[in-house]
A protein has these predicted regions:
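C-terminal coupling/interaction segments
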Residues: 253-300
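ABC transporter nucleotide-binding domain
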Residues: 165-256
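Short, flexible helix/strand-to-coil boundary loops that buttress conserved ligand/catalytic motifs
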Residues: 69, 215-218, 235, 265, ...
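Short loop/turn segments at beta->alpha junctions
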Residues: 89, 210, 276-279
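Short, surface-exposed beta-strand/loop "edge" segments at domain boundaries and coil↔beta transitions
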Residues: 148-149, 153, 228-231, 259-262
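ABC transporter nucleotide-binding domains
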Residues: 2-4, 9-195, 199-201, 207
Length: 300
């Protein structure tokens, strides 16, 4: 488990992280969402031990990360900008990583290069942005570390390669102790892969929750209730996060159990009612607006 304990990081007068508190459980995929400048990259660098926080600390399985090689051996950090030696090939980077990470699997790396169609002898600097990202991810996977910190991993990948990387992550979780932490400015990028999602804004985590719990607890309903008084009663009786109306069609996002929500709607004798699936984006918009934030100005 990664424990982030009241972490504050400053750059001069700028407070990039402000008392961040979070827990990242083992064998889950943690998504860290937020706009550019929200503090995602800084937080990943603090977790990896690249940056030292002014206050607080990060622990990996109970071990403080800062200046602790034993803790750092448990993780690998993939930055948002791919970093390779000048004129390096994938083979050369493989040999370098093998020295740094004792558990690096060279044979697996060679196999994955072939699967992804990457020439091991071609200079990486001649690769496209997406191809460089692929090499970075494959190197990170093959370190066999327990934790993989990924900063904008899917940025620059086409849809096919994005799905291939997601499948690779899922395979690793099934076959060994593996916990990826994926930072992204796009909720859509992480919705279909992450188990747990945290929203970072202005250096602090607004909230962090299991994705399944969010979707079980919040519902989107569209209904037509001919009696205006009963419609008003419905809005008062439910925990409404958002509502809008077009003509006679009422759209409501509410918190509560699906059975209870359905029961209250049917009591109002609707002409039509339907519970619709919610996207992660819609859930976050509803949650943050209740907290006093306009997420439309924070993300997307």
């Amino acid at each position: 488990m990664i424990s982030i304990e009241q972490v504050t990081k400053e750059f001069g007068d700028i407070r990039a992280l402000d008392q961040v508190e979070a827990q990242i459980s083992e064998n889950s995929i943690f998504g860290l969402a937020g706009t550019n400048g929200a503090g995602k990259s800084t937080l990943l660098r603090v977790i990896s031990g690249v940056l030292r926080p002014e206050k607080g600390q990060v622990k990996i399985d109970g071990l403080p990360v800062w200046e602790n090689p034993a803790a750092k051996r448990r993780l690998c950090f993939i930055p948002d900008t791919s970093c390779f030696f000048p004129n390096a090939t994938s083979e050369m980077m493989r040999d370098y990583y093998r020295v740094i990470y004792p558990g690096f699997d060279s044979g697996r790396f060679d196999e994955l290069l072939e699967q992804f169609g990457l020439d091991p002898r071609r200079k990486i600097q001649t690769f496209s942005k997406g191809m460089k990202k692929q090499v970075s991810v494959l190197l990170g996977i093959c370190t066999n570390t327990e934790y993989l910190l990924c900063d904008e991993t899917f940025d620059g990948l086409d849809p096919v390669m994005r799905q291939a990387v997601k499948s690779l992550f899922a395979s690793e979780i099934l076959n060994r102790k593996f916990t990826p932490v994926i930072a992204s400015h796009s909720l859509r990028e992480i919705e279909d892969i992450c188990d747990h999602v945290g929203l970072l804004h202005r250096g602090g985590i607004l909230f962090s929750r299991e994705l399944d719990d969010m979707k079980l607890d919040i519902h989107k309903i569209q209904c037509v209730i001919p009696d205006p008084l009963k419609e008003e009663e419905l809005l008062c009786e439910m925990e409404v996060l958002q509502h809008s109306k077009r003509g006679s069609l009422l759209t409501v996002i509410v918190r509560g159990s699906e059975e209870e929500v359905e029961r209250k709607i049917m009591e109002k004798q609707p002409l039509f009612s339907e519970i619709l699936p919610l996207s992660l984006e819609e859930i976050f918009i509803s949650e943050t607006e209740v907290a006093g934030y306009d997420i439309k100005n924070l993300i997307f």
